Curated annotation (Swiss-Prot):
It is an enzyme of class 7 (translocase). This is V-type ATP synthase alpha chain 2. The gene is atpA2. The keyword Transcription regulation does not apply. HAMAP family: ATP_synth_A_arch. Produces ATP from ADP in the presence of a proton gradient across the membrane. The V-type alpha chain is a catalytic subunit. It catalyses: ATP + H2O + 4 H(+)(in) = ADP + phosphate + 5 H(+)(out). GO terms for cellular component: proton-transporting ATP synthase complex. It comes from the Bacteria. Keywords: ATP synthesis, ATP-binding, Hydrogen ion transport, Ion transport, Nucleotide-binding, Translocase, Transport. The keyword Lipid metabolism does not apply. It comes from Treponema pallidum (strain Nichols). Belongs to the ATPase alpha/beta chains family.
Amino acid sequence: MIKDDVVTGRVVRVSGPIVYAEGLSACSVYDVVDVGEASLIGEIIRLDESKAVVQVYEDDTGMRVGEKVTSLRRPLSVRLGPGLIGTIYDGIQRPLERLFQEDGAFLRPGARSQPLDGSVRWDFRPHCNERGEALCAGIPIAPGSVLGTVQETPSVVHTIMVPPDIRGSVLSSFKGAGAYTIDEEIGRTDLGEPLFLSQYWPVRRARPFSKKLAVCEPLVTGQRAIDVFFPLSKGGTAAIPGGFGTGKTMTQHAVAKWCDADIIVYIGCGERGNEMTDVLSEFPKLIDPRTGRSLMERTILIANTSNMPVSAREVSLYSGITLAEYYRDMGMHVAIMADSTSRWAEALRELSGRMEEMPAEEGFPAYLPTRLAEFYERAGRVETCVAREGSVSIIGAVSPLGGDFSEPVTQHTKRFIRCFWALDRELAHARHYPAIGWIDSYSEYAQEVSAWWSKYDPRAGALRAAALDLLRKEQRLQQIVRLVGPDALPGEDRLVLMVCEMIKGGFLQQNAFDPTDVFSCPEKQVQILRTIVDFHERAVVLLRAGISLSALSQLSCRELIVRMKTTYGNEDVHKMQKVYDTMCTEFDQLSVCAAARTQGGEKVE
Protein backbone atom coordinates (compact mmCIF):
# COMPACT_ATOMS: atom_id res chain seq x y z
CA MET A 1 0.00 0.00 0.00
CA ILE A 2 1.36 3.43 -1.02
CA LYS A 3 0.38 6.47 1.03
CA ASP A 4 2.16 9.85 1.06
CA ASP A 5 5.22 8.32 -0.62
CA VAL A 6 5.44 5.65 2.11
CA VAL A 7 4.89 1.99 1.20
CA THR A 8 3.49 -0.38 3.81
CA GLY A 9 3.62 -4.18 3.77
CA ARG A 10 3.54 -7.07 6.23
CA VAL A 11 5.94 -9.75 7.46
CA VAL A 12 5.26 -13.21 6.03
CA ARG A 13 8.40 -15.05 7.18
CA VAL A 14 11.26 -14.53 9.64
CA SER A 15 14.64 -16.27 9.33
CA GLY A 16 16.94 -14.70 11.90
CA PRO A 17 18.04 -11.27 10.63
CA ILE A 18 16.38 -11.95 7.25
CA VAL A 19 12.69 -11.02 7.02
CA TYR A 20 10.39 -11.72 4.06
CA ALA A 21 7.62 -9.19 3.49
CA GLU A 22 4.79 -8.77 0.99
CA GLY A 23 3.21 -5.58 -0.30
CA LEU A 24 6.53 -3.84 -1.04
CA SER A 25 6.73 -4.45 -4.79
CA ALA A 26 6.64 -0.67 -5.42
CA CYS A 27 9.91 -0.22 -3.51
CA SER A 28 13.50 -0.31 -4.75
CA VAL A 29 16.43 -2.47 -3.75
CA TYR A 30 18.40 -0.95 -0.83
CA ASP A 31 15.44 1.14 0.36
CA VAL A 32 15.35 1.60 4.15
CA VAL A 33 12.39 0.05 5.97
CA ASP A 34 11.00 0.09 9.51
CA VAL A 35 10.20 -3.48 10.49
CA GLY A 36 7.73 -4.64 13.14
CA GLU A 37 6.14 -2.99 16.13
CA ALA A 38 9.54 -1.85 17.45
CA SER A 39 10.34 -0.09 14.12
CA LEU A 40 13.64 -1.91 13.62
CA ILE A 41 15.88 -0.51 10.90
CA GLY A 42 16.20 -2.75 7.86
CA GLU A 43 17.15 -2.63 4.20
CA ILE A 44 15.58 -4.29 1.18
CA ILE A 45 18.25 -6.47 -0.43
CA ARG A 46 16.13 -8.47 -2.90
CA LEU A 47 12.79 -8.07 -4.67
CA ASP A 48 10.60 -10.42 -6.69
CA GLU A 49 7.02 -10.21 -7.92
CA SER A 50 5.38 -10.83 -4.58
CA LYS A 51 7.96 -10.63 -1.79
CA ALA A 52 10.77 -8.40 -0.59
CA VAL A 53 13.76 -9.75 1.31
CA VAL A 54 14.70 -7.39 4.14
CA GLN A 55 17.97 -7.43 6.07
CA VAL A 56 17.27 -6.23 9.64
CA TYR A 57 20.12 -4.37 11.35
CA GLU A 58 18.83 -4.84 14.90
CA ASP A 59 17.92 -7.79 17.11
CA ASP A 60 14.55 -9.05 15.85
CA THR A 61 13.99 -11.70 18.52
CA GLY A 62 10.25 -12.11 19.09
CA MET A 63 9.14 -10.76 15.72
CA ARG A 64 5.90 -12.33 14.46
CA VAL A 65 4.36 -12.94 11.06
CA GLY A 66 1.87 -10.22 10.17
CA GLU A 67 3.75 -7.29 11.72
CA LYS A 68 3.92 -4.11 9.67
CA VAL A 69 6.84 -3.22 7.39
CA THR A 70 7.12 0.41 6.24
CA SER A 71 9.42 1.52 3.43
CA LEU A 72 10.83 5.04 3.70
CA ARG A 73 11.59 5.15 -0.07
CA ARG A 74 15.21 6.24 0.44
CA PRO A 75 18.55 4.39 0.63
CA LEU A 76 20.43 3.76 3.87
CA SER A 77 22.43 6.95 4.43
CA VAL A 78 24.75 8.50 7.01
CA ARG A 79 24.63 12.08 8.20
CA LEU A 80 27.81 14.00 7.50
CA GLY A 81 28.73 17.20 9.29
CA PRO A 82 30.61 18.70 12.25
CA GLY A 83 30.52 16.53 15.35
CA LEU A 84 31.64 13.24 13.80
CA ILE A 85 35.16 13.40 15.25
CA GLY A 86 35.58 11.72 18.63
CA THR A 87 32.23 9.90 18.42
CA ILE A 88 31.68 6.13 18.59
CA TYR A 89 28.90 4.76 16.37
CA ASP A 90 27.46 1.40 15.57
CA GLY A 91 27.26 0.17 11.96
CA ILE A 92 24.14 2.23 11.13
CA GLN A 93 25.52 5.44 12.68
CA ARG A 94 23.71 5.37 16.00
CA PRO A 95 25.83 7.17 18.64
CA LEU A 96 26.51 4.48 21.23
CA GLU A 97 27.55 6.85 24.01
CA ARG A 98 24.25 8.73 23.79
CA LEU A 99 22.26 5.49 23.64
CA PHE A 100 24.14 4.24 26.71
CA GLN A 101 23.06 7.32 28.62
CA GLU A 102 19.44 6.77 27.55
CA ASP A 103 19.05 2.96 27.71
CA GLY A 104 22.04 1.51 29.54
CA ALA A 105 24.74 -0.92 28.47
CA PHE A 106 22.58 -3.03 26.12
CA LEU A 107 20.95 -1.65 22.99
CA ARG A 108 17.16 -1.61 23.08
CA PRO A 109 15.62 -2.86 19.81
CA GLY A 110 14.31 0.14 17.92
CA ALA A 111 16.47 2.62 19.86
CA ARG A 112 16.99 5.86 17.98
CA SER A 113 19.24 8.85 18.46
CA GLN A 114 20.48 11.50 16.05
CA PRO A 115 24.03 10.78 14.84
CA LEU A 116 25.01 14.44 15.26
CA ASP A 117 24.10 16.60 18.25
CA GLY A 118 21.53 19.11 17.02
CA SER A 119 21.86 21.33 20.10
CA VAL A 120 25.48 22.35 19.49
CA ARG A 121 25.97 25.71 17.82
CA TRP A 122 28.98 25.83 15.51
CA ASP A 123 30.88 29.03 14.76
CA PHE A 124 30.56 29.20 10.96
CA ARG A 125 33.00 31.29 8.91
CA PRO A 126 32.14 31.86 5.23
CA HIS A 127 34.66 30.94 2.57
CA CYS A 128 36.72 33.80 1.12
CA ASN A 129 38.06 33.93 -2.44
CA GLU A 130 41.57 34.86 -3.54
CA ARG A 131 40.76 38.56 -3.17
CA GLY A 132 39.58 38.06 0.41
CA GLU A 133 35.90 38.56 -0.45
CA ALA A 134 33.49 36.46 1.64
CA LEU A 135 30.92 34.20 0.00
CA CYS A 136 27.55 35.89 -0.55
CA ALA A 137 24.26 35.51 -2.45
CA GLY A 138 24.55 35.49 -6.25
CA ILE A 139 27.82 33.55 -6.35
CA PRO A 140 27.90 30.50 -8.68
CA ILE A 141 28.23 27.17 -6.88
CA ALA A 142 28.81 23.57 -7.93
CA PRO A 143 28.78 20.18 -6.20
CA GLY A 144 31.60 20.19 -3.66
CA SER A 145 31.98 23.99 -3.58
CA VAL A 146 33.26 25.29 -0.25
CA LEU A 147 30.71 27.35 1.70
CA GLY A 148 32.84 27.94 4.78
CA THR A 149 34.50 26.28 7.77
CA VAL A 150 33.85 25.44 11.41
CA GLN A 151 36.41 24.44 14.04
CA GLU A 152 35.29 20.87 14.74
CA THR A 153 38.11 20.06 17.17
CA PRO A 154 41.17 22.10 18.18
CA SER A 155 43.17 20.20 15.53
CA VAL A 156 40.54 19.69 12.77
CA VAL A 157 39.00 22.47 10.68
CA HIS A 158 35.78 21.12 9.18
CA THR A 159 34.96 22.35 5.67
CA ILE A 160 31.26 22.90 4.91
CA MET A 161 30.64 21.90 1.30
CA VAL A 162 27.79 21.92 -1.19
CA PRO A 163 26.38 18.35 -1.35
CA PRO A 164 27.35 16.42 -4.52
CA ASP A 165 23.71 15.81 -5.47
CA ILE A 166 22.47 19.39 -4.99
CA ARG A 167 20.12 20.99 -7.53
CA GLY A 168 20.97 24.53 -8.56
CA SER A 169 24.04 26.43 -9.73
CA VAL A 170 23.73 29.82 -8.00
CA LEU A 171 23.58 30.74 -4.32
CA SER A 172 20.29 32.67 -4.11
CA SER A 173 20.50 33.39 -0.36
CA PHE A 174 23.24 33.06 2.24
CA LYS A 175 23.27 33.96 5.94
CA GLY A 176 26.99 34.55 6.35
CA ALA A 177 29.08 34.27 9.51
CA GLY A 178 27.39 33.21 12.72
CA ALA A 179 26.67 30.38 15.15
CA TYR A 180 24.35 27.73 13.71
CA THR A 181 23.17 24.25 14.57
CA ILE A 182 23.31 21.47 11.99
CA ASP A 183 19.53 21.78 11.47
CA GLU A 184 19.52 25.51 10.73
CA GLU A 185 19.45 26.60 7.10
CA ILE A 186 22.49 28.68 6.11
CA GLY A 187 21.59 29.27 2.47
CA ARG A 188 19.52 28.26 -0.53
CA THR A 189 20.19 27.60 -4.21
CA ASP A 190 18.41 29.22 -7.15
CA LEU A 191 16.22 26.09 -7.46
CA GLY A 192 15.12 26.34 -3.85
CA GLU A 193 17.39 23.63 -2.39
CA PRO A 194 18.25 24.45 1.26
CA LEU A 195 21.84 24.25 2.48
CA PHE A 196 22.85 23.17 5.99
CA LEU A 197 26.05 22.54 7.93
CA SER A 198 25.33 18.82 7.44
CA GLN A 199 24.32 16.57 4.56
CA TYR A 200 23.22 12.98 3.95
CA TRP A 201 24.88 10.44 1.66
CA PRO A 202 24.00 6.79 0.79
CA VAL A 203 26.58 4.43 2.24
CA ARG A 204 26.67 2.07 -0.74
CA ARG A 205 27.38 4.85 -3.25
CA ALA A 206 30.90 6.21 -3.64
CA ARG A 207 31.16 9.99 -3.39
CA PRO A 208 32.15 11.58 -6.72
CA PHE A 209 35.52 13.13 -7.50
CA SER A 210 37.22 14.69 -10.51
CA LYS A 211 39.97 12.13 -11.15
CA LYS A 212 42.23 9.60 -9.47
CA LEU A 213 45.88 10.51 -9.02
CA ALA A 214 48.98 8.36 -8.92
CA VAL A 215 50.24 7.54 -5.44
CA CYS A 216 53.67 8.93 -4.59
CA GLU A 217 53.86 9.64 -0.84
CA PRO A 218 53.98 6.97 1.87
CA LEU A 219 51.64 6.84 4.83
CA VAL A 220 54.28 7.18 7.55
CA THR A 221 53.35 4.92 10.45
CA GLY A 222 56.50 5.09 12.56
CA GLN A 223 56.79 1.28 12.35
CA ARG A 224 60.13 0.54 10.70
CA ALA A 225 59.12 -2.83 9.26
CA ILE A 226 56.22 -1.16 7.48
CA ASP A 227 57.63 2.20 6.42
CA VAL A 228 60.94 0.97 5.00
CA PHE A 229 60.39 -2.66 3.98
CA PHE A 230 56.69 -2.81 3.07
CA PRO A 231 55.45 0.79 2.69
CA LEU A 232 51.84 1.81 2.21
CA SER A 233 51.15 4.94 0.19
CA LYS A 234 48.55 7.56 0.99
CA GLY A 235 45.55 6.36 -0.97
CA GLY A 236 46.77 2.76 -0.93
CA THR A 237 45.29 -0.51 0.26
CA ALA A 238 46.85 -3.02 2.64
CA ALA A 239 45.85 -6.27 4.31
CA ILE A 240 47.10 -7.68 7.61
CA PRO A 241 46.40 -11.43 7.64
CA GLY A 242 47.35 -13.53 10.61
CA GLY A 243 46.19 -16.30 12.88
CA PHE A 244 44.88 -15.90 16.40
CA GLY A 245 47.27 -14.03 18.68
CA THR A 246 49.69 -12.84 16.01
CA GLY A 247 49.01 -9.14 16.65
CA LYS A 248 46.63 -7.94 13.93
CA THR A 249 44.68 -5.65 16.23
CA MET A 250 47.77 -4.35 18.02
CA THR A 251 49.44 -3.55 14.69
CA GLN A 252 46.34 -1.67 13.54
CA HIS A 253 46.21 0.18 16.86
CA ALA A 254 49.85 1.23 16.42
CA VAL A 255 49.21 2.46 12.87
CA ALA A 256 46.08 4.32 13.98
CA LYS A 257 47.99 5.98 16.82
CA TRP A 258 51.07 7.12 14.96
CA CYS A 259 50.40 7.37 11.21
CA ASP A 260 50.48 10.83 9.62
CA ALA A 261 46.89 10.74 8.33
CA ASP A 262 44.70 13.73 9.14
CA ILE A 263 41.69 11.59 10.13
CA ILE A 264 41.43 8.01 11.40
CA VAL A 265 38.27 5.92 10.94
CA TYR A 266 38.55 2.78 13.08
CA ILE A 267 35.96 0.08 12.29
CA GLY A 268 35.65 -2.74 14.81
CA CYS A 269 33.72 -5.29 12.76
CA GLY A 270 32.78 -8.46 14.62
CA GLU A 271 35.75 -8.40 16.99
CA ARG A 272 35.82 -8.46 20.79
CA GLY A 273 34.34 -5.51 22.65
CA ASN A 274 37.43 -5.26 24.86
CA GLU A 275 39.48 -4.21 21.83
CA MET A 276 37.22 -1.21 21.22
CA THR A 277 37.41 -0.47 24.94
CA ASP A 278 41.21 -0.38 24.65
CA VAL A 279 40.92 2.21 21.89
CA LEU A 280 38.51 4.32 23.93
CA SER A 281 40.74 4.18 27.00
CA GLU A 282 44.14 4.62 25.30
CA PHE A 283 43.58 7.11 22.49
CA PRO A 284 42.46 10.07 24.66
CA LYS A 285 45.67 9.72 26.70
CA LEU A 286 47.97 9.67 23.66
CA ILE A 287 49.30 12.85 22.11
CA ASP A 288 49.42 13.34 18.35
CA PRO A 289 53.09 14.25 17.66
CA ARG A 290 52.06 16.59 14.81
CA THR A 291 49.46 18.66 16.68
CA GLY A 292 50.26 18.09 20.35
CA ARG A 293 46.58 17.25 20.93
CA SER A 294 44.74 14.06 21.94
CA LEU A 295 44.47 11.39 19.25
CA MET A 296 40.70 11.19 19.78
CA GLU A 297 40.48 14.67 18.24
CA ARG A 298 41.15 13.10 14.83
CA THR A 299 39.45 9.71 15.29
CA ILE A 300 35.99 8.31 14.47
CA LEU A 301 35.08 4.89 15.87
CA ILE A 302 32.54 2.44 14.47
CA ALA A 303 31.88 -0.50 16.77
CA ASN A 304 30.06 -3.63 15.67
CA THR A 305 31.36 -6.10 18.19
CA SER A 306 30.84 -9.85 18.04
CA ASN A 307 27.69 -9.76 20.22
CA MET A 308 25.92 -7.14 18.07
CA PRO A 309 23.52 -8.13 15.25
CA VAL A 310 25.46 -9.90 12.52
CA SER A 311 23.69 -8.04 9.72
CA ALA A 312 24.97 -4.67 10.93
CA ARG A 313 28.55 -5.88 10.36
CA GLU A 314 27.86 -6.02 6.65
CA VAL A 315 26.96 -2.33 6.45
CA SER A 316 29.52 -1.04 8.97
CA LEU A 317 32.36 -1.07 6.41
CA TYR A 318 30.27 0.97 3.98
CA SER A 319 29.38 3.48 6.71
CA GLY A 320 33.05 3.86 7.62
CA ILE A 321 34.26 4.36 4.05
CA THR A 322 31.53 6.96 3.44
CA LEU A 323 32.68 8.99 6.46
CA ALA A 324 36.25 8.72 5.16
CA GLU A 325 35.30 9.93 1.67
CA TYR A 326 33.53 12.94 3.20
CA TYR A 327 36.73 14.11 4.92
CA ARG A 328 38.73 13.22 1.80
CA ASP A 329 36.57 15.70 -0.14
CA MET A 330 37.76 18.41 2.28
CA GLY A 331 41.31 17.79 1.06
CA MET A 332 42.39 15.59 3.96
CA HIS A 333 44.29 12.32 4.09
CA VAL A 334 42.17 9.66 5.80
CA ALA A 335 43.18 6.19 7.00
CA ILE A 336 40.64 3.42 7.62
CA MET A 337 41.36 0.50 9.96
CA ALA A 338 38.92 -2.36 9.30
CA ASP A 339 39.17 -5.06 11.97
CA SER A 340 38.33 -7.52 10.65
CA THR A 341 37.15 -8.12 7.10
CA SER A 342 36.97 -11.86 7.84
CA ARG A 343 34.18 -11.25 10.37
CA TRP A 344 32.47 -9.10 7.74
CA ALA A 345 32.76 -11.95 5.23
CA GLU A 346 31.36 -14.36 7.82
CA ALA A 347 28.35 -12.06 8.16
CA LEU A 348 27.87 -12.26 4.38
CA ARG A 349 28.07 -16.05 4.60
CA GLU A 350 25.46 -16.24 7.36
CA LEU A 351 23.06 -13.88 5.58
CA SER A 352 23.57 -15.76 2.30
CA GLY A 353 22.75 -19.02 4.04
CA ARG A 354 19.60 -17.53 5.55
CA MET A 355 18.49 -16.56 2.05
CA GLU A 356 19.22 -20.10 0.82
CA GLU A 357 21.69 -18.95 -1.84
CA MET A 358 24.05 -21.39 -3.52
CA PRO A 359 27.33 -21.37 -1.54
CA ALA A 360 30.77 -21.11 -3.13
CA GLU A 361 34.18 -21.84 -1.55
CA GLU A 362 33.94 -22.77 2.15
CA GLY A 363 30.31 -21.66 2.23
CA PHE A 364 31.01 -18.04 1.32
CA PRO A 365 28.66 -16.49 -1.25
CA ALA A 366 29.76 -16.33 -4.87
CA TYR A 367 29.65 -12.51 -4.74
CA LEU A 368 32.29 -12.26 -1.96
CA PRO A 369 34.98 -10.97 -4.40
CA THR A 370 32.55 -8.35 -5.73
CA ARG A 371 31.77 -7.05 -2.24
CA LEU A 372 35.47 -6.94 -1.32
CA ALA A 373 36.19 -5.01 -4.53
CA GLU A 374 33.39 -2.53 -3.77
CA PHE A 375 35.08 -1.74 -0.47
CA TYR A 376 38.77 -1.65 -1.42
CA GLU A 377 38.23 0.20 -4.72
CA ARG A 378 36.85 3.20 -2.82
CA ALA A 379 40.38 3.87 -1.59
CA GLY A 380 42.70 6.14 -3.55
CA ARG A 381 44.36 9.50 -3.89
CA VAL A 382 42.03 11.81 -5.79
CA GLU A 383 41.48 15.30 -7.05
CA THR A 384 38.10 16.39 -5.72
CA CYS A 385 35.37 18.13 -7.71
CA VAL A 386 36.80 21.52 -6.64
CA ALA A 387 40.47 20.66 -7.42
CA ARG A 388 41.49 19.76 -3.87
CA GLU A 389 43.72 16.76 -3.22
CA GLY A 390 42.74 14.11 -0.67
CA SER A 391 43.15 10.41 -0.10
CA VAL A 392 41.60 7.40 1.60
CA SER A 393 43.93 4.59 2.68
CA ILE A 394 42.46 1.24 3.75
CA ILE A 395 44.15 -1.22 6.10
CA GLY A 396 42.05 -4.34 6.51
CA ALA A 397 42.78 -7.12 8.98
CA VAL A 398 42.08 -10.67 7.81
CA SER A 399 41.61 -13.51 10.33
CA PRO A 400 42.01 -16.81 8.45
CA LEU A 401 41.08 -19.90 10.43
CA GLY A 402 44.22 -21.60 11.69
CA GLY A 403 46.39 -18.98 9.98
CA ASP A 404 45.73 -20.59 6.59
CA PHE A 405 46.40 -17.92 3.95
CA SER A 406 44.91 -20.09 1.21
CA GLU A 407 41.33 -19.60 2.47
CA PRO A 408 38.95 -17.54 0.25
CA VAL A 409 38.87 -14.21 2.13
CA THR A 410 42.68 -13.88 2.14
CA GLN A 411 43.04 -14.99 -1.47
CA HIS A 412 40.31 -12.70 -2.79
CA THR A 413 41.62 -9.79 -0.71
CA LYS A 414 45.06 -10.17 -2.32
CA ARG A 415 43.45 -9.42 -5.69
CA PHE A 416 42.41 -5.94 -4.59
CA ILE A 417 45.27 -4.78 -2.38
CA ARG A 418 48.86 -3.88 -3.21
CA CYS A 419 50.42 -4.18 0.23
CA PHE A 420 50.43 -7.46 2.16
CA TRP A 421 51.67 -7.54 5.76
CA ALA A 422 51.66 -11.26 6.59
CA LEU A 423 51.91 -11.84 10.34
CA ASP A 424 54.14 -14.75 11.33
CA ARG A 425 53.07 -16.97 14.23
CA GLU A 426 56.67 -17.91 15.10
CA LEU A 427 57.70 -14.26 15.32
CA ALA A 428 54.67 -13.48 17.48
CA HIS A 429 55.46 -16.36 19.86
CA ALA A 430 59.07 -15.14 20.02
CA ARG A 431 57.76 -11.73 21.22
CA HIS A 432 58.95 -10.09 18.02
CA TYR A 433 56.70 -7.07 17.47
CA PRO A 434 55.43 -6.22 14.92
CA ALA A 435 55.33 -9.85 13.76
CA ILE A 436 55.37 -8.99 10.05
CA GLY A 437 57.13 -11.81 8.22
CA TRP A 438 59.62 -10.55 5.65
CA ILE A 439 59.34 -13.67 3.47
CA ASP A 440 55.61 -13.70 2.71
CA SER A 441 54.97 -9.95 2.94
CA TYR A 442 55.28 -7.59 -0.01
CA SER A 443 54.49 -4.05 -1.11
CA GLU A 444 53.93 -2.88 -4.67
CA TYR A 445 54.24 0.74 -3.52
CA ALA A 446 57.97 0.53 -2.74
CA GLN A 447 59.06 1.77 -6.16
CA GLU A 448 56.43 4.53 -6.25
CA VAL A 449 57.50 6.04 -2.91
CA SER A 450 61.25 5.58 -3.44
CA ALA A 451 61.63 9.17 -4.66
CA TRP A 452 60.09 10.41 -1.41
CA TRP A 453 62.55 8.36 0.65
CA SER A 454 65.52 9.53 -1.41
CA LYS A 455 65.28 13.00 0.15
CA TYR A 456 66.45 11.41 3.42
CA ASP A 457 69.13 9.28 1.77
CA PRO A 458 69.75 8.84 -1.98
CA ARG A 459 70.61 5.21 -1.22
CA ALA A 460 67.32 4.49 0.60
CA GLY A 461 66.00 2.15 -2.10
CA ALA A 462 69.32 0.30 -2.35
CA LEU A 463 69.53 -0.03 1.45
CA ARG A 464 66.05 -1.58 1.57
CA ALA A 465 66.89 -4.02 -1.23
CA ALA A 466 70.19 -5.01 0.41
CA ALA A 467 68.56 -5.64 3.81
CA LEU A 468 65.72 -7.70 2.33
CA ASP A 469 68.23 -9.71 0.29
CA LEU A 470 70.19 -10.50 3.46
CA LEU A 471 67.03 -11.61 5.28
CA ARG A 472 65.99 -13.90 2.44
CA LYS A 473 69.48 -15.37 2.27
CA GLU A 474 69.40 -15.93 6.03
CA GLN A 475 66.10 -17.80 5.65
CA ARG A 476 67.77 -20.25 3.25
CA LEU A 477 70.84 -20.61 5.48
CA GLN A 478 68.70 -21.40 8.53
CA GLN A 479 67.60 -24.62 6.83
CA ILE A 480 71.25 -25.70 6.59
CA VAL A 481 71.97 -24.57 10.15
CA ARG A 482 69.18 -26.80 11.47
CA LEU A 483 70.86 -29.80 9.82
CA VAL A 484 74.60 -29.27 10.38
CA GLY A 485 74.91 -26.26 12.69
CA PRO A 486 76.37 -22.80 11.98
CA ASP A 487 80.03 -23.85 12.33
CA ALA A 488 79.85 -25.79 9.05
CA LEU A 489 79.06 -22.60 7.10
CA PRO A 490 81.66 -20.42 5.36
CA GLY A 491 82.64 -17.18 7.08
CA GLU A 492 80.60 -14.92 4.81
CA ASP A 493 77.46 -16.98 5.41
CA ARG A 494 77.99 -16.83 9.17
CA LEU A 495 78.42 -13.07 8.79
CA VAL A 496 75.02 -12.95 7.08
CA LEU A 497 73.49 -14.71 10.10
CA MET A 498 75.15 -12.24 12.46
CA VAL A 499 74.07 -9.16 10.51
CA CYS A 500 70.51 -10.45 10.14
CA GLU A 501 70.30 -10.76 13.92
CA MET A 502 71.28 -7.08 14.03
CA ILE A 503 68.57 -6.23 11.47
CA LYS A 504 65.91 -8.16 13.36
CA GLY A 505 66.89 -6.97 16.83
CA GLY A 506 68.05 -3.46 16.01
CA PHE A 507 65.69 -2.47 13.21
CA LEU A 508 62.61 -4.64 12.68
CA GLN A 509 61.70 -5.30 16.30
CA GLN A 510 59.99 -2.39 18.09
CA ASN A 511 58.94 -1.96 21.70
CA ALA A 512 55.41 -0.54 21.79
CA PHE A 513 55.85 0.32 25.49
CA ASP A 514 59.12 2.24 25.09
CA PRO A 515 58.38 5.95 24.49
CA THR A 516 61.61 6.25 22.49
CA ASP A 517 61.06 3.20 20.30
CA VAL A 518 57.28 3.24 19.82
CA PHE A 519 57.53 5.67 16.88
CA SER A 520 60.49 6.21 14.54
CA CYS A 521 60.63 9.19 12.22
CA PRO A 522 61.84 8.56 8.63
CA GLU A 523 65.28 10.09 9.30
CA LYS A 524 65.86 7.72 12.22
CA GLN A 525 64.72 4.70 10.23
CA VAL A 526 67.07 5.43 7.34
CA GLN A 527 70.00 6.17 9.66
CA ILE A 528 69.66 2.83 11.50
CA LEU A 529 69.33 0.83 8.29
CA ARG A 530 72.26 2.63 6.63
CA THR A 531 74.49 1.84 9.60
CA ILE A 532 73.60 -1.87 9.61
CA VAL A 533 73.94 -2.34 5.84
CA ASP A 534 77.27 -0.50 5.77
CA PHE A 535 78.44 -2.64 8.69
CA HIS A 536 77.84 -5.72 6.55
CA GLU A 537 79.51 -4.28 3.46
CA ARG A 538 82.65 -3.27 5.34
CA ALA A 539 82.72 -6.53 7.31
CA VAL A 540 82.68 -8.55 4.07
CA VAL A 541 85.73 -6.62 2.84
CA LEU A 542 87.62 -7.29 6.07
CA LEU A 543 86.58 -10.93 6.12
CA ARG A 544 88.06 -11.38 2.66
CA ALA A 545 91.18 -9.55 3.82
CA GLY A 546 91.83 -12.16 6.50
CA ILE A 547 90.00 -10.77 9.54
CA SER A 548 88.23 -13.55 11.45
CA LEU A 549 84.50 -13.51 12.17
CA SER A 550 85.17 -13.64 15.91
CA ALA A 551 87.13 -10.38 15.68
CA LEU A 552 84.22 -8.75 13.86
CA SER A 553 81.69 -10.06 16.36
CA GLN A 554 83.67 -8.55 19.25
CA LEU A 555 83.48 -5.00 17.89
CA SER A 556 81.88 -2.68 20.46
CA CYS A 557 79.95 -0.86 17.73
CA ARG A 558 77.71 -3.93 17.22
CA GLU A 559 76.00 -3.40 20.55
CA LEU A 560 75.78 0.35 19.94
CA ILE A 561 74.08 -0.24 16.57
CA VAL A 562 71.47 -2.62 18.01
CA ARG A 563 70.69 -0.14 20.80
CA MET A 564 70.38 2.91 18.51
CA LYS A 565 66.59 2.52 18.34
CA THR A 566 66.16 3.00 22.10
CA THR A 567 69.18 5.21 22.82
CA TYR A 568 68.26 8.06 20.47
CA GLY A 569 64.84 9.66 20.16
CA ASN A 570 63.44 11.28 17.04
CA GLU A 571 64.79 14.65 18.15
CA ASP A 572 68.32 13.20 18.53
CA VAL A 573 68.75 11.78 15.03
CA HIS A 574 71.81 13.96 14.41
CA LYS A 575 73.54 12.30 17.38
CA MET A 576 73.22 8.88 15.73
CA GLN A 577 76.09 9.85 13.46
CA LYS A 578 78.39 9.23 16.44
CA VAL A 579 77.60 5.51 16.29
CA TYR A 580 78.29 5.45 12.56
CA ASP A 581 81.60 7.27 13.13
CA THR A 582 82.53 4.81 15.89
CA MET A 583 81.82 1.93 13.53
CA CYS A 584 83.98 3.47 10.80
CA THR A 585 86.82 4.06 13.27
CA GLU A 586 86.79 0.45 14.49
CA PHE A 587 86.71 -0.88 10.94
CA ASP A 588 89.58 1.42 9.95
CA GLN A 589 91.63 0.11 12.87
CA LEU A 590 90.91 -3.46 11.82
CA SER A 591 91.84 -2.60 8.23
CA VAL A 592 95.22 -1.26 9.34
CA CYS A 593 95.74 -4.32 11.50
CA ALA A 594 94.71 -6.61 8.63
CA ALA A 595 97.13 -4.93 6.26
CA ALA A 596 99.99 -5.36 8.72
CA ARG A 597 99.16 -8.99 9.45
CA THR A 598 98.67 -9.77 5.75
CA GLN A 599 102.24 -8.71 5.07
CA GLY A 600 103.34 -11.15 7.76
CA GLY A 601 101.03 -13.89 6.49
CA GLU A 602 99.00 -13.97 9.73
CA LYS A 603 95.22 -14.01 10.28
CA VAL A 604 93.67 -11.54 12.70
CA GLU A 605 91.67 -13.36 15.38
